[in-house]
Amino acid sequence: MSASAQTQMRNLQGNHACALAAVAAGCRFYAGYPITPSSEIAERMAGELPQVGGVFIQMEDEIASIGAVLGASIGGVKAMTATSGPGFSLKQENLGYAMGAEIPCVVIDVMRGGPSTGMPTRPSQGDVMQARWGSHGDTVVIALVPDSVAEIYSQTIRAFNLSEQLRVPVVVLIDEIIGHLVETVAVPAPESLTLIDRKWADSPVDTFKPYAINGDDVPPMPRPGAGYRTHTTGLTHGEDGFPTQDPVLVAPMMDRILGKLERHRDLVDC
């Protein structure tokens, strides 16, 4: 098949490109709360997800939105939310939870002027440091920063791939300008995309350790309904997932969780 046959030229708004890319990447759950200038992402997801068997939920607030996304991801589906400014601030605790419990998800932050309520309809790039340092405890978060509508599409797909491959939350930083900008984008055919899905556990149920330290920085996830029993917590935990403060157990676990991004930096660096 020729390259031209694999792509479709479309005039897309940046926020719409983000939504379409998420669906193309396999996202089947979206929970969000309307907030300018990201609301078009939620609107588009509300229309797209039912067509592919996905679920869209408008939650009561920003904290509930990220909580629902983490629950859906644990439940076995690729999940995303989008927000801006003060909403991104409210999501930080659960972003840290996702890092500690190794729950893959994608968070889109369409940046606007701040601080506080700031300027909802004006652009800003003021959330870069928050994306990096927003959560406590030396949390490391991947942040991708597209600079065009075409890159919004490609980097949203990349965000899902990195999230699933490394079992981490991934943030995509857009701003109001490119979020609302309309450009002609070469949208690749779905069959031409390289998509990465999480590793699923296939070990015997009675010996399964959900956070195993076995030389692989990314342990497989238990598939819901497959008989695996697992405990998910934001507390420091051992390989079995249960809370512990034993330094003999905590030290290697934290090295694996916090160090895996540095050890796999080649996947992230452009």
Where is each model-derived feature located?
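Short, solvent-exposed polar/charged micro-motifs at secondary-structure junctions
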Residues: A68, S154, V182-E183
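Generic recognition of stable, solvent-exposed alpha-helical segments in well-folded globular domains
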Residues: A17, E40, E151-S154, V248, ...
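Thiamine diphosphate
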Residues: M1-W133, T139-V140, I157, E176
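Flexible, low-complexity linker and terminal segments
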Residues: S2-G14, E164-C270
